[in-house]
């Protein structure tokens, strides 16, 4: 783990920070840390009794508005956090800290209905034959054009088995296949270096390939649009360690040698909850 000293999107150094806590499930999964109660019998001279949780900082870039956790997990830590993502072992561990998670997780076993809206947004820009790579696509259940593309491949660190009809690829296989559409949907909010990830993706894109990016417009950001003090109100961090603004996304994409072909904010129902998603279609410069 390293502590961020620059913006994860625009690479600026004009940052504001405020204390927060790392949620117990993430702390346990990544660092094997447990919450602990400080009691009077500890005999502490300068600490007050009460529950102790892992401390961190919320950081906001004053240039692009990106809001993020200061902790940037390394490859091994990310592996511990996402290995077997949402499988029975993962779900049981998370249920211990977050009662009700297992029930919510059951809903995610079905393909998301809003994907038809995503396909309608990006479909007009695509040409055939369509070969799709879903980068960070889990099992491939929610890959756009799943049943309409000539081929669908998934690259994911979870190690989960992919859905029928999908090919799982490793890093070596990424460079050898002629992908016309690369999808990176609901991934950038999880990763320690969005810029590094986009650089990796750009390296496997052909000159005529398109990249579809999708990230949440988090409610806290949407409800406080334009605010420069978001760090003070963001008191906890879970698996979404990056909160994006449109300005931040534009800066990130440009920094990574990509250009935006289409950008819109989709407001729709996602697994029973109303949500907002940034939807970007990008090409190499």
What are these regions (language model features)?
Residues 5, 239-242, 246-256, 260-285:
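Rossmann-like AdoMet/SAM-dependent catalytic core
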Residues 205-211:
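Short glycine-dipeptide loop
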Residues 190-191, 220:
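Short glycine-rich, flexible loops that bind phosphorylated cofactors or substrates
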Residues 162, 221-222, 270:
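Generic structural signal for helix capping and beta-alpha/helix-loop junctions
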Residues 1-185, 194-198, 212, 228-232, ...:
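Conserved N-terminal segment of class I S-adenosyl-L-methionine
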Residues 24-35, 213-242, 247-252:
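Short, glycine-/aromatic-enriched active-site segment of Class I SAM-dependent methyltransferases
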Residues 201:
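Class I S-adenosylmethionine-dependent transferase superfamily signal
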Residues 186, 190, 240:
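Histidine-centered divalent metal-coordination motifs
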């Amino acid at each position: 783990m390293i502590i961020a000293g620059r913006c994860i999107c625009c690479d600026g150094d004009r940052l504001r920070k405020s204390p927060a806590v790392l949620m117990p499930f993430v702390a346990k999964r990544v660092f094997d840390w447990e919450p602990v109660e400080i009691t009077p019998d500890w005999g502490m001279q300068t600490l007050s009794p009460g529950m102790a949780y892992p401390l961190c900082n919320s950081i906001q870039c004053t240039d692009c508005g990106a809001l993020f956790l200061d902790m940037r997990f390394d490859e091994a830590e990310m592996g511990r956090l996402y290995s077997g993502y949402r499988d029975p072992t993962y779900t049981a561990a998370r249920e211990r800290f977050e009662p009700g998670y297992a029930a919510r997780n059951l809903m995610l076993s079905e393909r998301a209905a809003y994907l038809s809206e995503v396909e309608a947004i990006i479909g007009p820009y695509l040409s055939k034959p369509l070969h799709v790579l879903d980068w960070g696509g889990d099992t491939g259940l929610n890959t756009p054009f799943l049943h309409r593309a000539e081929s669908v491949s998934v690259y994911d660190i979870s190690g989960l088995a992919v859905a029928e009809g999908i090919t799982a690829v490793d890093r070596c296989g990424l460079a050898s296949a002629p992908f016309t559409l690369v999808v990176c949907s609901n991934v950038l909010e999880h990763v320690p270096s969005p810029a590094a990830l986009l650089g990796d993706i750009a390296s496997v894109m052909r000159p005529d390939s398109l990249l579809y990016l999708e990230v949440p417009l988090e409610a806290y950001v949407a409800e406080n649009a334009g605010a420069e003090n978001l760090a003070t109100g963001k008191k906890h961090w879970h698996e979404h360690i990056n909160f994006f603004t449109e300005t931040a996304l534009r800066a990130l994409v440009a920094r990574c040698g990509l250009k935006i072909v289409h950008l819109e904010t989709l407001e729709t129902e996602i697994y029973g909850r109303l949500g907002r998603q940034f939807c970007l279609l990008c090409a190499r410069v």
